């Protein structure tokens, strides 16, 4: 256990917490491991055992946020709402979370967007999670005969491709000035009608 009295996971969590604060206050370009280590109360060498470099620390910040988002989407998947409403809510939450992150935490969003453009492993895991959750929903919709004209796999693929500009981080940022939830909602509704939904 480090001399701070924190466990290894505690050091990691504290470093992430302090990094979030520094990004908010100064921008992610100004984050330095040596400064974070000093605030945590460990040597920068010790902090390297948790984060190989600055990029790894910034990735940990974004990964934590995406993990929270994945959990929100999972709660939607498991909710008692009708299946069409869950599919709709899934896409709206995915879009809304990224848009609000950019509006309220622009510097944190910049760090996330940078990782996203590089398709870091944790980004790929998030995308796989989103696809798996949606496939579960489309399979349920198929069983309920709301999707009858295509397979659940094809419906999942078409929904993800059609809604890409509402969920891709850089495109969300570029269209930040517009409230596009209505367009997204209408798009999902049109696709579901095309798949055989009432």
Give short role names for the model-derived ranges.
Residues 1-10, 80:
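N-terminal intrinsically disordered/low-complexity leader segments
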Residues 2, 89, 132-143, 161-162, ...:
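C-terminal peripheral helix-coil segments that are non-catalytic and often amphipathic
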Residues 8-11, 152-159, 180, 184:
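Short amphipathic alpha-helix in the helical subdomain of ABC transporter nucleotide-binding domains
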Residues 14, 18, 22-56, 60:
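Helix-turn-helix
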Residues 60, 74-100, 156-159:
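Hydrophobic alpha-helical connector segments
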Residues 63-70:
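Short, basic, alpha-helical segments at the C-terminal edge of helix-turn-helix-like DNA-binding modules
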Residues 70, 117-143, 153-157, 182:
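Amphipathic alpha-helical packing segments from all-alpha helical-bundle domains
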Residues 98-118, 168-171:
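Amphipathic alpha-helical segments used for helix-helix packing
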């Amino acid at each position: 256990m480090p001399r701070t009295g924190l466990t290894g996971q505690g050091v990691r969590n504290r470093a992430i917490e302090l990094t979030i604060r520094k990004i908010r206050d100064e921008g992610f370009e100004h984050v330095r491991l040596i400064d974070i280590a000093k605030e945590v109360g460990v040597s920068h060498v010790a902090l390297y055992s948790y984060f190989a470099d600055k990029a790894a620390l910034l990735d940990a910040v974004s990964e934590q946020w995406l993990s929270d988002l994945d959990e929100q989407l999972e709660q939607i998947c498991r909710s008692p709402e009708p299946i069409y409403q869950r599919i709709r809510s899934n896409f709206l939450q995915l879009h809304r979370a990224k848009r609000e992150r950019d509006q309220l935490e622009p510097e944190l969003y910049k760090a996330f967007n940078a990782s996203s453009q590089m398709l870091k492993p944790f980004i790929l895991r998030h995308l796989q999670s989103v696809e798996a959750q949606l496939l579960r929903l489309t399979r349920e919709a198929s069983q309920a005969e709301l999707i009858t004209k295509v397979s659940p796999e094809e419906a999942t693929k078409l929904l993800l491709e059609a809604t890409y500009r509402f969920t891709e981080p850089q495109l969300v940022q570029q269209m930040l000035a517009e409230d596009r939830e209505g367009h997204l909602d209408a798009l999902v509704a049109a696709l579901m009608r095309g798949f055989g939904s009432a």
